[in-house]
Every structure is written in C-alpha cells, then in structure tokens.
Amino acid sequence: MLNYFVYPYGIENDIGIKFYMILVPIISIVLIIINYIITNKSDNNINKTGPYECGFDSFRQSRTTYSIKFILIAILFLPFDLELTSILPYTLSIYNLNIYGLFILLYFLLPLIIGFIIEINLKAIYITKIFNRNVKSITSYVKYNNKI
C-alpha cells in the first residue's frame, strides 16, 4: 500500500526508466573517453592563443580594452530577464491562483525589486559619458580636436 503512494505510476517496475538511467551515463563516459583519445594533446600552436580574424593577420592589436561597466550591466541584466520569464506562467494562470498566487508573486518579486533599488543606489548601472560635454555636433568635434 505504501508503494502505491510513493510510486503511484508503477515506476519501480518500469524497466525503461532503469535502462535509461544506466545507459545515459555509460554513453556520456564513453563519448568523453573517445574525445580524450582522439584529440590532439599538443598546445604548442601559438595561433590557438591569438584572436581569430576571419583568416587574415590583423594590422594592429585586435584586443582592445573596454569598460568593465558593460560586462557588469550584462551580468545584472540576467536576473531581471529571468524574472520576466518566470512571471509569464503567472500571467496565464492568474484566474485560477486567486490571492494565494498573488502572495507567491509578491514573495518572488520583492527580493528582485529590493536588489534593483540597491543597484540604483550603488550606481552599479551608471555609465559615464566618454566625450566632452561641450561638443555639440560632429563638425564642432572635428574643429575642437583640430582635425580639419
């Protein structure tokens, strides 16, 4: 009687699931071993560490520096993007969930809203402008930098 409540669909007698649970790790391990045997183990090729430039040698250094703020914004974007995809099922079933679903949604959104407020207060998503504030257009920029 207890087995019916623990395994209501008769999983303990299903040979397909047991076969799957054994076969998948075996195939994964075999593929990893084959990959290890076939691959070239020498890392002496200097081109592997350089950037790939569509098959031609670059005329200048291709690894230019850029601000870490862009990476930070991309990392901060991820939780809020996942938040949006997690809210979508709620919008489809809002009629069935009633007030209980609303409390679950608020419990889910509250830490994200607090985190967003903290990010704004710490100015984690603030990007400084690189150009001079006195420059109004491209022509004045060229005149300003004496490139006429």
From Swiss-Prot:
Catalytic activity: a ubiquinone + NADH + 5 H(+)(in) = a ubiquinol + NAD(+) + 4 H(+)(out)
Transmembrane segments: 19-39, 70-90, 99-119
E.C. designation(s): 7.1.1.2
Signal sequence, renumbered to the chain: none
Coiled coil region boundaries: none
GO cellular component terms listed in the entry, alphabetical order: mitochondrial membrane; NADH dehydrogenase complex
A Pfam family hit: Oxidored_q4
Subcellular location(s) per record: Mitochondrion membrane
Keyword tRNA-binding in annotation: no
Keywords associated with the record: Electron transport, Membrane, Mitochondrion, NAD, Respiratory chain, Translocase, Transmembrane, Transmembrane helix, Transport, Ubiquinone
Membrane topology annotation: Multi-pass membrane protein
Single GO term (MF): NADH dehydrogenase (ubiquinone) activity
Similarity-based family: Belongs to the complex I subunit 3 family.
Purpose of the protein: Core subunit of the mitochondrial membrane respiratory chain NADH dehydrogenase (Complex I) that is believed to belong to the minimal assembly required for catalysis. Complex I functions in the transfer of electrons from NADH to the respiratory chain. The immediate electron acceptor for the enzyme is believed to be ubiquinone.
Protein known as: NADH-ubiquinone oxidoreductase chain 3
Species, as recorded: Wickerhamomyces canadensis (Yeast)
The gene coding this protein: ND3
